[in-house]
Amino acid sequence: MKVKEVMSAELRGVRTDTSLKDTAEHMRLLDIGSLPVVSPENNRVVGMITDRDIVVRSVARGADVSTQNVGDVMSSPLVCCHEDDEVEEASTAMKAKRVRRVLVLNDKNQPVGLVSLGDLAQGPIDQAELTSVVRNVSTPAPAEAP
């Protein structure tokens, strides 16, 4: 099965210069936990911001989320796949990079959606492979220096 058959196609983004407070509010209203990050200079996706990025890289360090911007704490580089890739390729990328979401690109390398662990769970992926991906991305990474 192709990625385009299981991905979430409604894609919303946020600019690197958007405050973390505004980004968190946007996530709350949309009931989502991540957004692609777009550069205001060239309108290209340059990273992802997650609710976890905001908490771990800003709130936990005592930063002011009203003045700190998305570009300061976003995850980069991006982990991507193409909409015509097999679903297994997306799961392999998630496992290798230890991410829960992968940006989906079209044949012109333009973002067209996201594929998440939840999308994989609803697709035809082998249960053993799904378990392997979940275990891998859920294993704690080495702690960052304070």
Functional labels for PLM-detected ranges:
Residues M27, L35-D53, M94, V102-G118:
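A glycine-centered beta-loop-beta connector
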Residues S8-D17, N43:
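Short N-terminal leader segment in a subset of presequences, especially plant chloroplast
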Residues M1-E10, T50-C80, D85-K95, P111-P146:
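Tandem CBS (Bateman) regulatory domains
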Residues G13-D31, V38, C81-R98, V104-N106, ...:
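The conserved cystathionine-beta-synthase
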